[in-house]
């Protein structure tokens, strides 16, 4: 039998039917639903007189529109309130379990599914959200889909799809102190570009990747999308198994033992061939900061803003010039001199307990700079919030002048009350720095949680490695 990649194994085990043109009917093990991309899907079921085919394979939560301040006051914005209320009604009508706004398990969909054991190795996982790739960190095939496809999965638990090409990104060595999975994935995107992974399913592998926790691996897979890929994944190892053991929806007893035996095979075979392969040295990676309006516009903290005049490619040169104009930055500006108005620590990229611990370790005993208007710390779920409070992290943040919020997508995107005002500059642990992503006219710089906390205290970007040493 020929050697197979992890992607091959996951794909082939879910093929229901293959058409002559290469189209594949793929079985979907888990669908995750939220309030933004599901309403029309439920309406389609209702109009056709259909029920959900497998109620137990679908689970929902509200995350994009929920307020991160006083939940008891409800949702002020009428459109946001309608979306959340509609999700509640649809889930009740179709019998789908929902972690509602006042459920202690509620949170960002890509945080709650792994922490609940709803995402398991070997699964196919879909959601009407591009960052569904996050779940690949557990050895799953996970990807975002459109609203019409959400309806198809509700109705049939299957989906028409075409197989991607395979890419392996191998990271040798060990990340240095103060350098995180977020820095690694930003460095990868800086190298291959936001189109580098287009048409591929990316497997992250190598000693540096398998030295990461599952939460760090989720950060890598989460931003595979920003590299242009359809999905990202990491092979199963003992770290994966230990993470899942005892999760509420994970198997138990003999079924757990059987599952672990199967999961142990979910890695690429030693001789497996990939369509493309990229290799990096972890020791070469430093803390990263984006300077422009695309995740690929990123440099080390010690660098300066690039000069478009030095770029030979005319398309890239114009893109850089436009980005600098929007970001109100001059070429050759030291990254460390860029002052900030706000800081956001949260999102499906970096709002798990390890992320909050990293930020709190930097913030402990300090206070935000007077020039920084606000620092929002938004846990990824109610359970992450409770764990952080049990560890006293909330007190560290409050003592530092940071705001401790309720779980939700928050300032990752301007779809709720947490947003930037025109011209405001933000250090953000989220995944996208597009124009207007955090609010019309807002300027976003992507960083790790530790880098964000250090910037909040200094009032500008600093090398968190120096901060940790002192």
UniProtKB/Swiss-Prot annotation:
Keywords: 4Fe-4S, Amino-acid biosynthesis, Branched-chain amino acid biosynthesis, Iron, Iron-sulfur, Leucine biosynthesis, Lyase, Metal-binding. It catalyses: (2R,3S)-3-isopropylmalate = (2S)-2-isopropylmalate. Its cofactor is [4Fe-4S] cluster. Its EC number is 4.2.1.33. [4Fe-4S] cluster binds at residues 348, 409, 412. The keyword Amino-acid biosynthesis applies. One of its GO terms (biological process) is L-leucine biosynthetic process. GO terms for molecular function: 3-isopropylmalate dehydratase activity; 4 iron, 4 sulfur cluster binding; metal ion binding. It comes from the Bacteria. Pathway: Amino-acid biosynthesis; L-leucine biosynthesis; L-leucine from 3-methyl-2-oxobutanoate: step 2/4. Binds 1 [4Fe-4S] cluster per subunit. Catalyzes the isomerization between 2-isopropylmalate and 3-isopropylmalate, via the formation of 2-isopropylmaleate. PANTHER family: 3-ISOPROPYLMALATE DEHYDRATASE, HOMOACONITASE, MITOCHONDRIAL-RELATED. Heterodimer of LeuC and LeuD. Belongs to the aconitase/IPM isomerase family. LeuC type 1 subfamily. This is 3-isopropylmalate dehydratase large subunit. It comes from Acidithiobacillus ferrooxidans (strain ATCC 23270 / DSM 14882 / CIP 104768 / NCIMB 8455). The gene is leuC.
